[in-house]
Each structure stands twice: as structure tokens, then as C-alpha cells.
Amino acid sequence: IAMIKKSLLLIVFLVIGCNNPSSKNQKVIPNSSGNINTISVVMPEKAWRGTLGNKVRDLFQTPYEGLPFDEPQFSLKYLNPKVFSGFARQSRNILWFVKDSLSQFQMLQDAFARPQIVALFKGNDDDEQAFYLEENTSLIKQSITENERIEKLRRISKAPTTETNLKKRFGISLRYPTAYKTVKDTTNFIWIQKPTTTGHLN
């Protein structure tokens, strides 16, 4: 009888364990990756070299206003749909163009990684997809800009600067990454700059 009770008790534990949601294998969403202000663009190569690709470049690589030199708002990274799998899907910002009889636009959050913005354009041809792109450019830019702002703050919090020049000289507390260095320090002027070899910060 004791053995029977032990067996029944073991079965009860097994049943409870199997029905416990926390014990089931849950999908693990990886961390997103990519440089700041970089967007992965997924479409057929012919479309990328044609009108649709030009439309994406015109809308998302417009220069910032007020700078003495042209710096695009976003850097674009082209991906062929054939390689859009695995690690390639972990980009933080994605424009995904798909040929489909059901024409629609969708904004997906954390679809393949976290944090992530995926703008999905479906249409019978490039013209339909370009229409949805133009209609939603403002929303997409706002979403990506906010996504990048959060990512910048996360990176700053991981490696904040230890320089105290601003605090000592002007009583100003400013948090910025260690990648930025003081390159000029005078009586009433401090110049902080991030060294770059690409001509822009994207």
C-alpha cells in the first residue's frame, strides 16, 4: 500500500509539472542588434535597384537640416529575402517588402528580436508597396527614432563617461558615452566629440 501511495504521489507531481506553464519550453526572443540609426531593407534585388529602392533611399536618407555637411537621417543596409533568416532577422529596425495578393501595411513590434520595429509592406507589385511606404513614412520614422532614442540611453547607461570637466567648470551634469572625448577645453568653452572615420555617426 505504501508503494502504491508513493507511486500515486509521483504521478500527481508529474501531472502538475507538465501542466505548469512556467515549465513549458517558451520561445526565447534574442536581443536585437545593429548600429544606431541603421535600417535593414528586405526586398528583391531588382526592386532595390529600381524605383522602389530609390523611393526608400529618397525617404529615409534625407540629410539632417542645419548641419554644415550632409549626414543622412538613417543608414540603409540591403538584405536579399533569400538571406533574411536567423541572425539577419535580429536587426533592430527593418523595412520588409513582400509580394502578396493581399495588399496591406503592418507595424510589428519585437517580431524576431527585442527591441525591434518591423514595417511590413505587402502588395501585388512595387507600386502598391511604394504607396504604403509613402503613406506611412512619418509613422515609421517616429517609431524608429523613438526606438533608437531608447537604445542610445541603454548604451549610455552601460558605459557612461567619467569625465567631470563640465561639472567642475560650469556646474552642468551631462550623461554621455565614453566614446565621446573632450577635444578642446578652454576657459569658457568645452568641445566634446566622438571620433569617427566614416564621415558620419550612423
Regions found by a protein language model. Give the residues of each.
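Sec-dependent signal peptide recognition
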Residues: 4-11
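C-terminal motif of bacterial Sec signal peptides marking the signal peptidase cleavage site
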Residues: 15-17
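N-terminal targeting sequences that direct proteins away from the cytosol to non-cytosolic compartments
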Residues: 19-201
